Amino acid sequence: MFIDKQTVERHFSKSAHLYDGVNHVQRKMAHRLVQLLDEKRRDAKDEPRAILDIGCGTGWLTRECLKSFPQATIDAVDLSKQMLEVAEKNVSSHPNVQFIQGDIEKMVREKPSAKTYDVIVANAVFQWLDKPTETVAQLRSWLKPNGLLLFSTFGPDTFYELHDSFQLAAKQLGIIDERRGLDYLSKTEWKRTLDGLFAELTIHEEKAIESYATVEQFLHTVKKMGATYSQSSRPLSKRYYQLMKEIYEQRYRTEDSIPATYDCLYVLCQA
């Protein structure tokens, strides 16, 4: 799967100052990651001293890690300079945090890390990678013995209401439907590709349903999050778009809102 990183970086940079107002699901996912990390390390003798936060965005997960592990040093990496600027303000330029602009796929591919980490975390990031499973495998060498890699990402049922509505609209119009948005790996696919690479692998899957007043509001919120990337090369006609919205409303509207499903995966890997 090819992801145009320049397009991704541009979208998130434009949304950097709006992101914290609309990223409700991503914040819940960050909180859940730290909860899982706390549970995993409950019986550990030592707290993590070195943490890598991949795709730190506006620093929400970075702050959560600082709360749980105040003595740790954190390297926070993101593709977007604008996101990093917001993150630095959000953590009040904490002396234990170093912000690094970069593409984690290039970083792990081009040179080994000069340091290793007790914990590597990534919240709602790996769906934006060209080769997510290969990158996770390469990150294995960045972990200390018994180190933890814990990440969240989205599964294939994410926005299934939207994709279903597009498919039905395409069928009614007699056109070929191209999936819009990203192709997400399933829990089974992650397990199959990561089995054997780590001493321990655990994957949790949880569904989150967000409610919106209209389909338009839902799509506008996704745009504010910077998550409007599409692999489809075909322009979206006004007729196709309008019919999709009508079908979405007819099939999924409750009394006062329409739902959007987020299929959340939480993956814990121990070296």
From Swiss-Prot:
The lineage of its organism: Bacteria, Bacillati, Bacillota, Bacilli, Bacillales. Belongs to the methyltransferase superfamily. Signal peptide: none annotated. GO terms for molecular function: carboxyl-O-methyltransferase activity; malonyl-CoA methyltransferase activity. This is Malonyl-[acyl-carrier protein] O-methyltransferase. Pathway: Cofactor biosynthesis; biotin biosynthesis. It comes from the Bacteria. Its EC number is 2.1.1.197. The keyword Transmembrane does not apply. Converts the free carboxyl group of a malonyl-thioester to its methyl ester by transfer of a methyl group from S-adenosyl-L-methionine (SAM). It allows to synthesize pimeloyl-ACP via the fatty acid synthetic pathway. It comes from Halalkalibacterium halodurans (strain ATCC BAA-125 / DSM 18197 / FERM 7344 / JCM 9153 / C-125).
